[in-house]
From Swiss-Prot:
GO terms for cellular component: cytoplasm. Keywords: Hydrolase, Manganese, Metal-binding, Protein phosphatase. It holds the Pfam family Metallophos. Gene3D superfamilies: 3.60.21.10. Belongs to the PPP phosphatase family. This is Serine/threonine-protein phosphatase 2. Mn(2+) 1 binds at residues 22, 24, 51. It comes from Escherichia coli (strain K12). Its cofactor is Mn(2+). The keyword Hydrolase applies. InterPro entries: Ap4A_hydrolase (IPR050126), Calcineurin-like_PHP_ApaH (IPR004843), Metallo-depent_PP-like (IPR029052), Ser/Thr-sp_prot-phosphatase (IPR006186). The active site is at 78 (proton donor).
Length: 218
């Protein structure tokens, strides 16, 4: 099992820091929203909660953002499905989840997509940022348990897939996670950004709704 990858980002290096919900191949929508936010790549940072690919029409264009110094991402379950398909040769689950875009690419584009997706073997599962003494932890779906600790070993699947915590929250059973002030997640789709206890869910379903949500850390 691969070890859990954490990364700390120094907020002082940037004018503004935004976290974006699941992009799912909506490159043009992302660019439009960044323009509306007056995002300036030379001094701002954009962090994705993962699931950059699938469903939308421009997954490769979104993956190419990994080459830009102003963009980074944690790993999502859709990136994990793609990597598993490459490693096992069984792409059925990925195809059923929107991975068909890959097979519409030509050979050189497919190789480029593979090379970019392989970056998720090294990109973090969790990003930690502290700004104005407020500590944020960013992961794709959840941070299991009730205590966050930078560097704690966690099974990758527990960060990429679970929805049980948020489902309990929807039923009124709020669960605080200690160790950070706020946790920012995607994965679970809502019409608008939702906050339960100290967990903020920012996936608003861009391919189906035309909504792509951002949370401003700084």
């Amino acid at each position: 099992m691969p070890s859990t990858r954490y990364q700390k980002i120094n907020a002082h290096h940037y004018r503004h820091i935004w976290v974006v919900g699941d992009i799912h191949g909506e490159y043009q929508l992302l660019q439009s929203r960044l323009h509306q936010l007056s995002f300036f790549p030379k001094i701002d940072l954009l962090i994705s909660v993962g699931d950059n690919i699938d469903r939308g029409p421009e997954s490769l264009d979104v993956l190419r953002l990994l080459n830009q110094p102003w963009f980074t991402s944690v790993k999502g379950n859709h990136e994990a499905m793609a990597l598993e398909a490459f490693e096992t040769g069984d792409g059925n689950m990925w195809l059923a989840s929107g991975g068909d875009w890959f097979f519409d690419l030509n050979d050189s584009e497919q190789q480029e997509a593979i090379d970019l997706l392989l970056k998720f073997h090294h990109l973090p599962h969790i990003i930690e940022i502290t700004n104005d003494n407020i500590k944020y932890a960013i992961a794709h779906a959840d941070y299991p348990g009730s205590e966050y600790l930078f560097g704690k070993e966690i099974a990758e699947s527990e960060l990429l897939w679970p929805v049980d915590r948020v489902q309990k929250s929807l039923n009124g059973e709020l669960q605080q996670i200690n160790g950070a002030d706020y946790f920012i997640f995607g994965h679970m789709m809502f019409d608008n950004i939702q906050t339960f206890a100290n967990q903020i869910y920012i996936d608003t379903g861009s391919p189906n709704s035309g909504r792509l949500s951002f949370y401003k850390i700084k």
